[in-house]
């Protein structure tokens, strides 16, 4: 039976804690997309480069970005989850990007109840290497060639 992720609320404690629906687990080299019509996750494609998702990737429930899709989110946690998993997470900041449709923000968040990240409240609390890794991944994962890549930048915390 298909799941109705569209009916899932943003979260009881938003904006401090929000519900994220995971499309792609950490470590995957496959890009999955949610098929709204059928209520399932489909393999969109393997990544073009020998990359993997550095953290779980999905969307924040109950949101809508300028491009008509829910807000994208990368969820930092100790372990990968799975396609379709709903994770309560705490937003930390945003990665400002552009794609063919225009602005394409990626929210960076952490698992709300992961004791390994309990002290992380803003992007400033993350190691610089983690931020660079996320930024690097986001620059490379959609484009097969360097000339197609868009610039991104990591601003201050949310």
Predicted regions and their residues:
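A cross-family signal for N-terminal binding/gating loops and helix N-caps
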Residues: 2-55, 69, 79-86
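Residues that form generic nucleotide/phosphate-binding pockets
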Residues: 21, 133, 137-141
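Domain-level detector of nuclease and nuclease-like folds
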Residues: 60, 65-72, 76, 82-112
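Short hydrophobic/aromatic residue motifs in ordered secondary structure
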Residues: 64, 148-151
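Conserved small/polar residues in nucleotide/adenosyl-binding loops
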Residues: 141-148
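Hydrophobic alpha-helical segments, chiefly the membrane-spanning helices
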Residues: 152-158
